[in-house]
Amino acid sequence: MQMDKDGLVLITGAGGFIGGHLVRDLRECGFQHLRAVDIKPLHEWYQRFDDIENVQADMTLREAAYDATKGARYVFNLAADMGGMGFIENNKASCMLSVLTSTHVLMGAKEQGDCERFFYSSSACVYAAGKQ
């Protein structure tokens, strides 16, 4: 499926390393309507672009996730709590919030009916239990 470059693309976790690079690449490919969302304050984002919509919001909050997904035809859900080796084993409650984040973003995209494609990416910092 070819993505329409005029369709609204939502990138959650956009203030992080991978999310920031995805936003950059989508801009370079000519996508016109990008909504970048991250829980971090804008000045803490890995990279930020002033010619797109940048939003600081907490996707663990249902209303914020629904606001973020409003009108989005394509969703790249990269938002997650992470912290490297040992994080999952030592921060189970935080990991449960990542599940809540994914649930809220997915529900918002589905229930608003505009989303054609939804991409979920696991954290870059997932390790086998024996390496935690």
Where are these predicted regions, by residue range?
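A short, basic/flexible loop-to-alpha-helix module at the beginning of a structural domain
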Residues: 1-6
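N-terminal Rossmann NAD(P)H-binding glycine-rich loop of SDR-like oxidoreductase domains
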Residues: 7-29
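Structural motif
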Residues: 8, 73-74, 117
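Conserved Rossmann-like nucleotide-binding pocket used by diverse enzymes
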Residues: 10, 35, 55
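Short loop/helix-cap segments at secondary-structure boundaries that form the rim of catalytic
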Residues: 43-50
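NAD(P)H-binding glycine-rich loop region in Rossmannoid oxidoreductase-like domains
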Residues: 52, 59-97, 129
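Conserved Rossmann-fold NAD(P)-dependent oxidoreductase catalytic core, especially the SDR/UDP-sugar
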Residues: 77, 103-132
